[in-house]
């Protein structure tokens, strides 16, 4: 090997080694911290929340559906937060939206104004798994003031892994989360939303209730859907997600994660 070729080979190898950490950092799954709830009151205000670790959804690269209809951060963006205690998950969002709280009953539930929570209740689950498992859930929170329908989609969970926990509420018009509470406060740019969801909502007689603990890391993700309301405008409905692409609906490896802390 001549000296020039040898130097080129060594230089290329060095460049690859140096770029590897940057590539790993670029592709690392996003993570937030959920602190233990301390005096959280479900009133739509975020005064009692630790807001140090948000899941931010505001970039054009985070539009996963009908991107040509997304008109920027003021059209649709959100900052999500999570907290916990021994029996509940607490969720909050500061939503920027130009046509907030829009719902049309004839549309599929994924075409309504909604917030979607993707959550695993198994801290031992492989974050690189590409198939939903027994403890993976997709929860819909409909942003329709006065109704607040909810649903859980389990259609993507293989039948032998569902443990008889099937989809509920996907036709709309129901609140399927027993003990769920939510509230909003309207703002000049949209609204703030907060909610509490009992962990028992993700269990049945075959799936144990998850008992959270400091240090647990769970796969999770957030998405938000915006229908321009009223009609017309129902053919294309932009949707944004904290992490991943439309594959998040079938592939948990594209989710982010949340670590539980005091």
Name these PLM-found stretches:
Residues 1-10:
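Bacterial N-terminal signal peptides that target proteins for export
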Residues 20-24:
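Sec/Tat signal peptide C-region and signal peptidase I cleavage site
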Residues 11-19:
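Bacterial N-terminal signal peptides
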Residues 10-11, 168:
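General helical structural elements
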Residues 25-262:
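Structural preference for beta-rich elements and adjacent junctions enriched in aromatics
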């Amino acid at each position: 090997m001549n000296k020039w070729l040898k130097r080129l080979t060594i230089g290329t190898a060095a460049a690859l080694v140096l770029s590897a950490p940057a590539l790993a950092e670029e592709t690392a799954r996003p993570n937030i911290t959920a602190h233990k709830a301390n005096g959280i009151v479900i009133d739509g205000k975020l005064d009692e929340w630790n807001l140090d670790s948000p899941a931010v959804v505001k970039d054009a690269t985070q539009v996963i559906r009908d991107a040509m209809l997304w008109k920027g951060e003021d059209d649709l963006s959100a900052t999500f937060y999570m907290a916990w205690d021994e029996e509940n998950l607490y969720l909050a969002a500061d939503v920027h939206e130009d046509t907030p709280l829009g719902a049309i009953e004839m549309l599929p539930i994924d075409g309504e104004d909604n917030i979607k929570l993707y959550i695993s209740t198994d801290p031992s689950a492989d974050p690189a798994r590409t198939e939903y498992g027994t403890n993976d859930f997709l929860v819909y929170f409909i942003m329709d003031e006065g109704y607040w329908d909810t649903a859980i989609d389990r259609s993507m969970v293989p039948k032998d892994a569902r443990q008889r926990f099937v989809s509920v509420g996907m036709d709309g018009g129901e609140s399927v989360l027993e003990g769920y509470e939510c509230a909003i406060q309207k703002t000049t740019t949209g609204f703030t939303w907060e909610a509490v969801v009992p962990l028992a909502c993700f269990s049945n007689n075959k799936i144990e209730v998850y008992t959270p603990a400091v240090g647990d890391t769970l796969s999770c993700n957030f998405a938000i859907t915006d229908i321009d309301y009223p009609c017309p405008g129902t053919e294309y409905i932009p949707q944004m997600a904290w992490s991943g692409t439309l594959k998040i609906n079938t592939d948990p490896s594209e989710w982010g994660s949340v670590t539980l802390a005091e």
